[in-house]
Amino acid sequence: MQQPIIGVGHSMGGCQIATLSVTSRRIFSTMILLDPAIGPPEMGLATLGLGQLTLRRRTQWLTREDAEKALRTSFSTWDPQVLDLLIKHSIHSDKQSVEMEDGPFSLVTGRYQELVNYIKPSFIRSGKVVGQELVHQTGPVDMYHMLGLVTCSTLYLCGGESTLSTPRARELWLSRTAELSYPKDPGEMRKVDERIVPDTGHFLPMEEPKECADIIADWIDKDECMIWNCHIGKQGKIWRDLSNTNRKMNAEVWMKYLQSKL
């Protein structure tokens, strides 16, 4: 894929973007993680009670109006346009044929799809639907232990009132990200920073989408694009513009130079 590629992810998506940056090193020129689900074992999924909340959450209503009212109540802090989009795309009719009445209505994404983000569906392999040991997904904790392996500039964008990106969590993210100090390419600048959006919670991109977009654009435009255009992209263009003959000549000169160093 042609660079630059910028990774942006929220919550579990932030964890997945960060994981991809480690497993496919240098795939991203930079990444922006919005309130990512990344933390040590004492801050892992087993401690948050998300599975219990998911199983208790209502997912079906008799009418579309009832479903819309429930969503508008649950997500009342969201930006109105974002909330309208959620309602438009997250509710569907359960009717089995055109002869049936419109209702009932359910969420497009059911409990199971959400639950397996938090708890491993071990019954799929064992065939036993009861009596299985409860095993939580370990992705957020795994990524926490891999933060030192990150090699691209990283911005943590956090909600000021979020219960996930607490001051302690942000301190750990900033201190551990890219801490192993892998050798840098010429011109490479590896930054780690944070920005806080006041009066927002974990759903900050849905609550204040414009402010989040402005912060992300500022990070990309003022810093990352300049670095790319002035250094990394320019160096890559020099190599791409060389003929195969000149590339081979450069490689031979480089290997001869290495003989005096190794």
Swiss-Prot record:
- Disruption effect? Abolishes the production of ACT-toxin and impairs the formation of lesions on leaves sprayed with conidia. Does not affect growth rate of cultures, sporulation, and spore germination.
Q: In which pathway does it act?
A: Mycotoxin biosynthesis
User: What is the residue range of the motif Peroxisomal targeting signal type 1?
Assistant: 260-262
The principal location of this protein is: other
| Gene3D superfamilies, per the entry | alpha/beta hydrolase (3.40.50.1820)
Source species, domain of life: Eukaryota
A single GO molecular function term of this UniProt record: hydrolase activity
According to its UniProt record, where is this protein located? Peroxisome
Please state, per the UniProt record, what induces or represses the expression of this protein.
Expression is positively regulated by CSN5 during infection.
Alphabetized, the UniProt keywords read:
Hydrolase, Peroxisome, Virulence
Which Gene Ontology cellular component annotation is one that this UniProt entry carries? peroxisome
Enzyme Commission number(s): 3.1.1.-
The record's Pfam families line, in alphabetical order, gives: Abhydrolase_6
Q: Where are the transmembrane segments?
A: none
Q: Which family does it belong to?
A: Belongs to the AB hydrolase superfamily. AKT2 hydrolase family.
Q: What does this protein do?
A: Abhydrolase domain-containing protein; part of the gene clusters that mediate the biosynthesis of the host-selective toxins (HSTs) ACT-toxins responsible for brown spot of tangerine disease by the tangerine pathotype which affects tangerines and mandarins. ACT-toxins consist of three moieties, 9,10-epoxy-8-hydroxy-9-methyl-decatrienoic acid (EDA), valine and a polyketide. ACT-toxin I is toxic to both citrus and pear; toxin II the 5''-deoxy derivative of ACT-toxin I, is highly toxic to pear and slightly toxic to citrus.
Supply any other comment.
Gene clusters encoding host-selective toxins (HSTs) are localized on conditionally dispensable chromosomes (CDCs), also called supernumerary chromosomes, where they are present in multiple copies. The CDCs are not essential for saprophytic growth but controls host-selective pathogenicity. Although conventional disruption of ACTT2 could not be accomplished due to the high number of the copies identified in the genome, the high sequence identity among these copies of ACTT2 is likely an advantage for RNA silencing, because it allows knockdown of all copies of this gene simultaneously.
**What's the protein called, per UniProt?**
Abhydrolase domain-containing protein ACTT2
- Which gene name does the record give? ACTT2
